[in-house]
Amino acid sequence: MSFTDPIGDMLTRIRNASNARHEKVLVPASRLKVRIAEVLRDEGFIKDFVRHEDGPQGAITIVLKYSGDREPAISDIKRVSKPGLRRYVPTDSIPRVLNGMGIAILSTSKGVMVDREARKQKVGGELICTVW
């Protein structure tokens, strides 16, 4: 099975599972997807994730996070840079998501990181997605 936008597929699976109040979601694995999952975990948007080495590609099980009244930790997650239109931003143009209430995930020359970290290290890069 081939996807035009594997990162967009991962984000859509997370959004749909979160809106349906599922406990877990399974996505095909890649190094970039694992790094995005690490950032989401470190920022408190997901509980945890586990990488499975099943088959040639493997998979990632993402455990979603909810508040006490079953409200999802992820209100929305949007893909910004797409295969048909890549969006690169310099350091001074990195957006602030909801005035700091959300995060922007960037792929930089120093790895995948959140907007706050990219500003601190003074690096720009490809704006993968925004989460709040």
Curated annotation (Swiss-Prot):
<protein>
    <recommendedName>
        <fullName>Small ribosomal subunit protein uS8</fullName>
    </recommendedName>
</protein>
<keyword id="KW-0694">RNA-binding</keyword>
<dbReference type="GO" id="GO:0019843">
    <property type="term" value="F:rRNA binding"/>
</dbReference>
<dbReference type="GO" id="GO:1990904">
    <property type="term" value="C:ribonucleoprotein complex"/>
</dbReference>
<keyword id="KW-0687">Ribonucleoprotein</keyword>
<dbReference type="InterPro" id="IPR035987">
    <property type="entry name" value="Ribosomal_uS8_sf"/>
</dbReference>
<dbReference type="GO" id="GO:0003735">
    <property type="term" value="F:structural constituent of ribosome"/>
</dbReference>
<dbReference type="GO" id="GO:0006412">
    <property type="term" value="P:translation"/>
</dbReference>
<comment type="similarity">
    <text>Belongs to the universal ribosomal protein uS8 family.</text>
</comment>
<keyword id="KW-0699">rRNA-binding</keyword>
<dbReference type="GO" id="GO:0005840">
    <property type="term" value="C:ribosome"/>
</dbReference>
<comment type="subunit">
    <text>Part of the 30S ribosomal subunit. Contacts proteins S5 and S12.</text>
</comment>
<keyword id="KW-0689">Ribosomal protein</keyword>
<comment type="function">
    <text>One of the primary rRNA binding proteins, it binds directly to 16S rRNA central domain where it helps coordinate assembly of the platform of the 30S subunit.</text>
</comment>
<dbReference type="InterPro" id="IPR047863">
    <property type="entry name" value="Ribosomal_uS8_CS"/>
</dbReference>
<dbReference type="Pfam" id="PF00410">
    <property type="entry name" value="Ribosomal_S8"/>
</dbReference>
<dbReference type="InterPro" id="IPR000630">
    <property type="entry name" value="Ribosomal_uS8"/>
</dbReference>
